[in-house]
Amino acid sequence: MNNNNNNRGRFPPGIGAAGPGPDPNFQSRNPNPPQPQQYLQSRTPFPQQPQPQPPQYLQSQSDAQQYVQRGYPQQIQQQQQLQQQQQQQQQQQEQQWSRRAQLPGDPSYIDEVEKTVQSEAISDSNNEDWKATLKLPPRDNRYQTEDVTATKGNEFEDYFLKRDLLRGIYEKGFEKPSPIQEESIPIALTGSDILARAKNGTGKTGAFCIPTLEKIDPENNVIQAVILVPTRELALQTSQVCKELSKYLKIEVMVTTGGTSLRDDIMRLYQPVHLLVGTPGRILDLAKKGVCVLKDCAMLVMDEADKLLSVEFQPSIEELIQFLPESRQILMFSATFPVTVKSFKDRYLKKPYIINLMDQLTLMGVTQYYAFVEERQKVHCLNTLFSKLQINQSIIFCNSVNRVELLAKKITELGYSCFYIHAKMVQDHRNRVFHDFRNGACRNLVCTDLFTRGIDIQAVNVVINFDFPRTSESYLHRVGRSGRFGHLGLAVNLVTYEDRFKMYQTEQELGTEIKPIPSLIDKAIYCQ
């Protein structure tokens, strides 16, 4: 069989192996093939295209006209549509490659992002109205400060997150990324280490939970990420946020803390766990027993990192890191970073991306007052504040466990509802108090500094320092319990003669101003 016949078998009539063009051996089925036309010279620089001739089997002139009207323009239109689709695909590919060139980090993960983008781009055509099916919570119309509103205008969709994760984000009540989330999420998704410093109540939890959940593979039943927190209450709160954000994902979240049944935790770890949230001591204990296997854990998050790197926790964390793979990613978040953080960063973080959104340490939306009182006048002053202020919920801080219990008893005797919580309580009792106060079962909570770290209760608009804190760092975290996520709050400090020097020192170290309390406090500064 010769090449000409092979060409005729492989290619359509009139097209040879070298491309479009007449085949000299091709015999047309049309007995009257169209003759080459001589182009007439005209004013137009380009020759007119020859019109197609209708086949001989079309007998009438009307049939021939319909053939030309239907066939020829339709071919032109199909070619134009094909060219437009090719141009659009080329533009999308160029945009993706330009975006890819700007992203630092692991190229393999960027490939995964590109595949996710392409797959979701295909599904977008069929699911353009997916947001219409969301069960959104009531919109929070309270005033917000620039801490959370001064954003770059990004949307959560800009980070190419999983559709089911986006559903959880929006149904959680997140509308747009806060400044710390805008800075952290895209960097964390590239696999880089992060050292982030941001104010209390500006969305740090979402800044590390969202990229952590995005990078977890639900099909791989191993522990892929660990979130470390310094307190049991913060562990419960963080795990609850993770569960709410991932409710449409098949991600198993486990929380483990000291004070709970070790046997129950061991039994739970025999089931699939993708994300582990807990305190360092308990997780280290489980890892030493060989029950908590961390060899596939590629992500370690440290919330309230300054507290985690204190003398109390740092040895446990350094020992725990030895159970992680060498290619781990570490994310550190806090409002303050002492010297110990820098030494830890130099030893364990690999070229970390530094984020510092702390132009001012104290929150912009919290108004701070002080009242000079004698020790024996404090309870009477507190009673006056309760009667004068419009309190949604308040947290009252004392410096010792005994003073917490005594003050809670006094407040109850005055006729106000009150809970108290401190570190010496049984863990089940602490959990119940925390849960009930968060759900609004009581208006006032008396506690020690145990409750200063990361606890997020949106209804709290008043913080009262019954005892002035011993350090400026503790003051910062106490005040941060009000004015959450840019909302307005009020902090009142009951200051004795012995406390005045600590208050002045706190003002200097934090660069803030604590004003004397006026006779009448405008509700607009803490109730909007």
UniProtKB/Swiss-Prot annotation:
Q: Which residues form the Helicase C-terminal domain?
A: 365-525
Its predominant location is cytoplasm
- What SUPFAM superfamilies does the record tag this protein with? P-loop containing nucleoside triphosphate hydrolases
Please give the residue ranges the record annotates as the region Disordered: 1-80
Q: Which UniProt keywords apply?
A: ATP-binding, Cytoplasm, Helicase, Hydrolase, mRNA processing, mRNA transport, Nucleotide-binding, Phosphoprotein, RNA-binding, Translation regulation, Transport
Q: Where in the cell is it found?
A: Cytoplasm, P-body
Lineage: superkingdom: Eukaryota
Q: What are the residue boundaries of the Helicase ATP-binding domain, all occurrences included? A: 185-355
An annotated GO BP = mRNA processing
Give residues where Phosphothreonine occurs.
T260
Q: What EC number(s) does this enzyme carry?
A: 3.6.4.13
Which positions in this protein are listed as binding ATP? A198, K199, N200, G201, T202, G203, K204, T205
- Which stretch carries the motif Q motif? 154-182
| Cited SMART domains | DEXDc, HELICc
In this record, what's one Pfam family?
A: Helicase_C
State if Glycosyltransferase is listed as a keyword.
no
Q: Motif DEAD box residues?
A: 303-306
Q: Biased-composition ranges for Low complexity?
A: 1-15, 65-80
Q: Which reaction does it catalyse?
A: ATP + H2O = ADP + phosphate + H(+)
Name the protein family: Belongs to the DEAD box helicase family. DDX6/DHH1 subfamily.
Q: Regarding domains, what does the record say?
A: The Q motif is unique to and characteristic of the DEAD box family of RNA helicases and controls ATP binding and hydrolysis.
Question: Tell me, what does this protein do in biology?
Answer: ATP-dependent RNA helicase involved in mRNA turnover, and more specifically in mRNA decapping.
Protein name in UniProt: DEAD-box ATP-dependent RNA helicase 6
Q: Which organism is it from?
A: Arabidopsis thaliana
Q: Which gene encodes it?
A: RH6
